[in-house]
Regions:
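Short glycine/acidic-enriched loop and turn motifs that connect beta-strands
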Residues: 76-84, 139-144, 195-199, 264-267, ...
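Blade-loop segments of beta-propeller domains
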Residues: 88-131
Length: 460
């Protein structure tokens, strides 16, 4: 009986450890700012947990952090029957507590009271500047319009915000960005999306209080860009991503007059609404250049300093996979003068192909901790992993880091023969597992004596 209770307690501890897992990295403070990982779920740190999650899927492409909750949108999850008797593949929004990583009840997505099952119907999810969650559906190069919705975060019901017309220059749209208020009650609303495999950028604008969206480029819906970085690029290629920047005054706060576009074969570049290239990675040292094939960028401000976070490389990068750089922008918020602070995670989220979805989601929330400003940063890479980080002068992690189970080399929460295999691979040169978990006998080195200790643990 005692042995059964001990096993049950250990199993419970292992479960808690997995749920509260951090990346285990120590990030050095830079210019009085610290960063800590609150929690992480990914193929690298929780390889036997994250791949089993319903939101680890190639149709779960984007995520957003809003009001302390992480929302992950997955299209075409499960069969549902409409009142007309039709079968559709219903979309689901998965929710996690941003403070702990604990799963909250998912939202089955509906439209007009019916299961919502449009093809890639929740391809793009985000939050406006007033906490409203929006959903942008995928649309092909043959579709002249794109539906855009608000999500009810209690029920999963969608409300149509606008049917966005692409005008005469039609191209495929994968991902959107929003600045302002999608309800137009508290501010204007601007919606942007670059066109896939084109040089198109679409923009729609509605004044505060207006029911109508119109072209956001001085009345035009689409602007064809002519300047890129690198200069050899002539279009965005696959699944590009746009991100508008907050203005510097009350009058222009939500105009989104400056915006980044990050394409498959280009680095993030900053434009204005005339199409002029304002800034790029041209003057950035080469070691900080992102690799081709991954799209994602965001800005934030803390302690009077301006930062950029961008996708460094995707699963096939020369690094360890799906990481992001966090850099302080240079004088005048220039890219060329930026200073790297950290790479997150320092090791990896994962190195598994997501089928070419390209997008890497980032966004932030602001709060205070221990009397100082704090930025909470979400990083999400489809089919590879998700993590929440905090940045500030006095930040601390998401509670005390659970102590690893001695002998649990592969981090799956149990000690068995699979850990022996992992340990032997480590000794033979596999860098996947840390020295800390592999030093089973705690003598300061990892060698064959640790294998003996581990085998004895299993046989006890």
């Amino acid at each position: 009986m005692k042995k059964f209770l001990l096993v049950a307690v250990l199993a419970l501890m292992a479960t808690v450890s997995v749920m509260a897992k951090t990346d285990g990295q120590t990030y050095e403070p830079v210019n009085d700012l610290k960063i800590v990982n609150v929690w992480i779920q990914d193929r690298f740190h929780t390889p036997d947990v994250f791949p089993k999650k319903d939101y680890c899927h190639t149709r779960a492409r984007t995520a957003v952090l809003s009001n302390g909750v992480v929302y992950i949108a997955r299209s075409e999850v499960k069969e549902a029957i409409t009142t007309a008797g039709d079968t559709v593949a219903q979309a689901v929004i998965y929710r996690l507590d941003a403070a702990t990583g604990e799963e909250l009840a998912p939202l089955d997505v509906t439209l007009n009271g019916e299961p919502y099952g449009a093809f890639l119907g929740v391809n793009s999810i985000g939050a406006d500047n007033f906490g409203h969650i929006w959903i942008g559906a995928y649309s092909s190069e043959k579709s002249a319009e794109n539906p855009f919705y608000q999500l009810n975060t209690e029920t999963g019901e969608l409300t149509l915000i606008a049917t966005l017309n692409k005008g005469d220059n039609i191209s495929r749209i994968d991902y959107f960005d929003v600045m302002g208020d999608i309800t137009r009650e508290q501010a204007e609303c601007n919606i942007m999306a670059p066109g896939s495999q084109t040089a198109n950028v679409y923009r729609w604008h509605a004044d505060q209080g207006s029911d109508t969206f119109e072209g956001g480029f001085e009345g035009d819906i689409c602007l064809v860009m002519t300047s890129f970085y690198p200069e050899t690029v002539t279009e965005w290629s696959y699944a590009p991503y746009a991100r508008m920047c907050l203005g510097s005054s009350e009058d222009d706060m939500y105009m989104g007059e400056l915006f980044y576009v990050d394409g498959f074969n280009s680095a993030p570049a900053l434009y204005d609404v005339t199409g002029s290239l304002i800034d790029s990675f041209e003057a950035v040292e080469s070691s900080l250049h992102p690799e081709a094939g991954t799209n994602g960028v965001a800005e934030f401000n803390i302690d009077g300093r301006n930062f950029i976070v961008y996708s460094r490389a995707q699963y096939a990068g020369t690094g360890r996979g799906c990481q992001a750089n966090i850099c302080e922008l240079g004088e005048g918020m220039s890219l060329g003068g930026m200073t790297k602070y950290w790479q997150i995670p320092a090791d990896s989220l994962g190195q598994t192909s997501d089928g070419g979805n390209r997008v890497h989601s980032f966004n932030v929330e602001y709060s205070q901790e221990n009397g100082s400003d704090v930025v909470t940063l979400l990083t999400f890479k489809c089919f590879n992993g998700i993590g929440v980080y905090k940045i500030g002068k006095n930040v601390s992690g998401g509670g005390e880091e659970p102590q690893p189970l001695t002998g649990d080399v592969n981090g799956d929460g149990v000690v068995n023969v699979s850990d022996v295999t992992s340990l032997v691979n480590k000794i033979l040169g596999d860098p996947t597992y840390s020295d800390t978990v592999c030093d089973v006998n705690a003598d300061g080195v990892v060698n064959v004596s640790d294998v003996t200790t581990l085998v004895n643990l299993i046989l006890v």
